[in-house]
Amino acid sequence: MNSGTVKWFNSTKGFGFIQPDDGATDVFVHASAVERAGMRSLVEGQKVTYDIVRDTKSGKSSADNLRAA
């Protein structure tokens, strides 16, 4: 499980980015992952833990299994 800070999240557009604590490249997060976690939204500066999953069709990575830290 990875940890990081929400860089920004736009609930109208349905996505945002998490800045990993380890300094890696920002991680995309989709609104569907937020909903699956039982959260309403994410706020800038919020600490979260997450897994990185790769879409088999597009090959792109995103955050999933979000939890407030």
UniProtKB/Swiss-Prot annotation:
Start and end residues of each CSD domain: 4-66
InterPro entries: Cold_shock_CspA, Cold_shock_domain, CSD, CSD_CS, CSP_DNA-bd, NA-bd_OB-fold
SUPFAM superfamilies in the cross-refs: Nucleic acid-binding proteins
GO molecular function terms listed in the Swiss-Prot or TrEMBL record: DNA binding
Keywords annotated in UniProt: Activator, Cytoplasm, DNA-binding, Stress response, Transcription, Transcription regulation
Subcellular localization(s) per the UniProt record: Cytoplasm
One Pfam family matching this protein: CSD
CC terms in the record's Gene Ontology section: cytosol
SMART domains (alphabetical): CSP
Keyword Transcription carried by entry: yes
Swiss-Prot/TrEMBL induction comment: By cold shock.
Protein name per UniProt: Cold shock protein CspA
Native source organism of the sequence: Rhizobium meliloti (strain 1021)
